[in-house]
Regions:
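Hydrophobic structural segments
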Residues: 1-135
């Protein structure tokens, strides 16, 4: 699991999804959501990259929302149904590439500090495999 934390101010699931869409680079997938648009979100669990293997993790289950990537149909459907019946997080599914893109500049800065004689570059190549979606 990447991180679990609390938002500075509670917001709705819909507002959080919009905020993510505004911060992440645009992708064909956008931000997919499972849960009540107006649900109040305070506690966030996050896993960059593919994270459906953590859907049953107690920290994820205790959060109001789980933000990750590459959610597969059956694990996401089961988590959604479980959340409706027994409580659990809403889901926000973002592009794998976009979820990892956020930390590249930070990682580069840390590498530059640790290896001052090495040239550290951050690629600007977009590696998201999807070019467009038709809805």
């Amino acid at each position: 699991l990447g991180r679990v934390g609390r938002l500075a101010q509670p917001m709705t699931l819909g507002a959080l999804a919009r905020a993510l869409a505004d911060v992440l680079p645009a992708t064909a997938q956008g931000v997919r959501a499972a849960g009540d648009f107006d649900r109040t979100i305070e506690t966030v669990a996050l896993c960059a990259g593919a994270g459906d293997s953590l859907l049953s993790d107690p920290q994820v289950r205790a959060a109001d929302v789980y933000i990750t990537s590459d959610l597969r149909h059956h694990p996401a459907s089961e988590a959604r149904e479980s959340s409706r019946l027994r409580g659990g997080p809403a889901l926000l599914d973002v592009s794998h590439w976009a979820s990892e893109w956020l930390w590249l500049d930070t990682a580069a800065a840390q590498l530059r500090a640790a290896l001052p004689t090495a040239e550290v570059l951050v690629s600007e190549l977009r590696t998201d495999p999807w070019d467009f979606a038709i809805v």
